[in-house]
């Protein structure tokens, strides 16, 4: 079942029940028009800003080159570090809370893309990065997205709080992978 909710940036996003994120095209959570358009849009919500960006329907967002056809990457509109990128799956997943063990590869691919974007922008000190996810209900956008921040030692005081490692509201990609494996 899909409901609209305010999810940040003054936009409305679709909120789904945990199982809806993994349902196939034509599932109860999608409108018939969207599900019928194409298999690639099976988990697409026109009300979700990240779904629109991933579908190249937001001309104001510059997508960065990404070697993974299932992901898109772009700069965060409110950067917390000199390098602050978001890696977003084209498929709509509400947030990391709804991921299962069989989606570990997705998270690993998101990290790989994040590192590649940093390298392409001449940043290679991966010990000085922060890659992670906000945990519900602290997600500003109800669409899974990996924050890639570097250099981590240049985060402001507030940003160090907002992106605090393995807190109640932000977890690293490594921590998420570890939790999904257990």
Curated annotation (Swiss-Prot):
Keywords: Cytoplasm, Hydrolase, Nucleotide-binding, Nucleus. It is found in: Cytoplasm; Nucleus. It catalyses: adenosine 5'-phosphoramidate + H2O = AMP + NH4(+). GO terms for molecular function: adenosine 5'-monophosphoramidase activity; nucleotide binding. Pfam families: DcpS_C. Its EC number is 3.9.1.-. AMP binds at residues 76-77, 145-147. Its main location: cytoplasm. CDD domains: aprataxin_related. Transmembrane segments: none annotated. Residues 1-34 are annotated as: Disordered. Residues 49-158 form the HIT domain. It comes from the Eukaryota. A motif (Histidine triad motif) lies at residues 143-147. One of its GO terms (cellular component) is cytoplasm. The active site is at 145 (tele-amp-histidine intermediate). Forms dimers to octamers and even larger oligomer. Interacts with CALM1. PANTHER family: ADENOSINE 5'-MONOPHOSPHORAMIDASE HINT3, APRATAXIN-RELATED. Exhibits adenosine 5'-monophosphoramidase activity, hydrolyzing purine nucleotide phosphoramidates with a single phosphate group such as adenosine 5'monophosphoramidate (AMP-NH2) to yield AMP and NH2. Hydrolyzes lysyl-AMP (AMP-N-epsilon-(N-alpha-acetyl lysine methyl ester)) generated by lysine tRNA ligase. Belongs to the HINT family. This is Adenosine 5'-monophosphoramidase HINT3.
């Amino acid at each position: 079942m899909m409901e609209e909710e305010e999810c940040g940036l003054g936009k409305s996003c679709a909120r789904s029940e945990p199982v809806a994120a993994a349902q196939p095209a034509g599932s109860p959570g999608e409108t018939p028009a969207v599900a019928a358009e194409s298999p690639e849009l099976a988990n697409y919500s026109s009300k979700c800003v990240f779904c629109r960006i991933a579908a190249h329907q937001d001309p104001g967002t510059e997508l960065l080159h990404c070697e993974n056809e299932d992901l898109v990457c772009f700069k965060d509109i409110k950067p917390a570090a000199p390098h602050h990128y978001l890696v977003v799956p084209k498929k709509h997943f509400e947030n990391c809370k709804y991921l299962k063990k069989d989606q570990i590869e997705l998270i690993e691919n998101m990290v790989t893309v994040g590192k590649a974007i940093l390298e392409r922008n001449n940043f290679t000190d991966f010990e000085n990065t922060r890659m992670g996810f906000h945990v519900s209900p602290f997600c500003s956008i109800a669409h899974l997205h990996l924050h890639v921040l570097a250099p981590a030692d240049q985060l402001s005081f507030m940003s160090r709080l907002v992106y605090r490692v393995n807190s109640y509201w932000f977890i690293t990609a490594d921590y998420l992978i570890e939790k999904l494996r257990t």
